[in-house]
């Protein structure tokens, strides 16, 4: 009983921590999960990250365990993950890993794939591993479905699905700043994040992303000038991704090199593009 599945990384448009409402978009970077099940009644689950062997496999092991418990089987399992989403890049590698792990386990069991079940079990696993504050339903759905999702994270509802109408690039900056997840400070900017979310729900994703980035970078003491530097170099929009320290900038292909040069003085960069091809079983 084997199965392989992939799920996307995602970038932030609106961080949901302040208000419970968020938005994210799928990017063309993926994590693949390979699951092998053994019907031996022992419930032994072992995981490994092929591309990053030092990474603890506890999240994907938890995903497999939760799927097996849901379907009330006592199989053992091996799970390996491999992908091109940089860890701690602000591109929702944990959402991608958990989605892929759950999907591959369901596939290995030969059960019917139900999107709501995949997302629920993936988010449950992330909560249990203390990897999320809000459940990150926006990140999880953008990773799973691709495109843009606008969500009520508290109720786990997708309010709107969309996609970028233009052919654009995504440049991710990964500076060596110390991560800061001060929930109390993020709650202070709630009313202003609401204003950015209004732009988002109206379909003005570029302005929403930029405003969100300014607000959260201010609350978390990350430099806001980085986003402005990206605009100066030709980016359409730019802002903090998630709770940082990474930033994302969106630009047209002809401005890609200028924007990357403006950002890479702050740290490593990765260039990708939005994706509407969501999670899927490979074989």
Swiss-Prot record:
- Supply the alphabetized keyword list: Amino-acid biosynthesis, Aromatic amino acid biosynthesis, ATP-binding, Cytoplasm, Kinase, Nucleotide-binding, Transferase
Q: Per UniProt, where does ATP bind?
A: 86-96
What this protein is called in its record is Shikimate kinase
An annotated Gene Ontology molecular function: ATP binding
Q: What SUPFAM superfamilies does its record include?
A: GHMP Kinase, C-terminal domain, Ribosomal protein S5 domain 2-like
Q: Name the Gene Ontology biological process terms.
A: amino acid biosynthetic process; aromatic amino acid family biosynthetic process; chorismate biosynthetic process
Q: Which residues form a coiled coil?
A: none
PANTHER family annotated for this entry?
A: HOMOSERINE/4-DIPHOSPHOCYTIDYL-2-C-METHYL-D-ERYTHRITOL KINASE (PTHR20861), SHIKIMATE KINASE (PTHR20861:SF3)
Q: Which GO terms describe its cellular component?
A: cytoplasm
Question: Its Enzyme Commission number?
Answer: 2.7.1.71
Compartment annotation: Cytoplasm
Q: What is its main location?
A: cytoplasm
Question: What lineage is on file?
Answer: Archaea, Methanobacteriati, Methanobacteriota, Methanomada group, Methanococci
Pathway noted in the entry: Metabolic intermediate biosynthesis; chorismate biosynthesis; chorismate from D-erythrose 4-phosphate and phosphoenolpyruvate: step 5/7
- Catalysis performed (reactions): shikimate + ATP = 3-phosphoshikimate + ADP + H(+)
Name the gene behind this protein: aroK
Taken from the record, one Pfam family name reads: GHMP_kinases_C
User: Where does the source fall among the domains of life?
Assistant: Archaea
Q: Does the keyword Transmembrane helix apply?
A: no
Class of enzymatic activity (EC top level):
transferase
Family membership, please give it.
Belongs to the GHMP kinase family. Archaeal shikimate kinase subfamily.
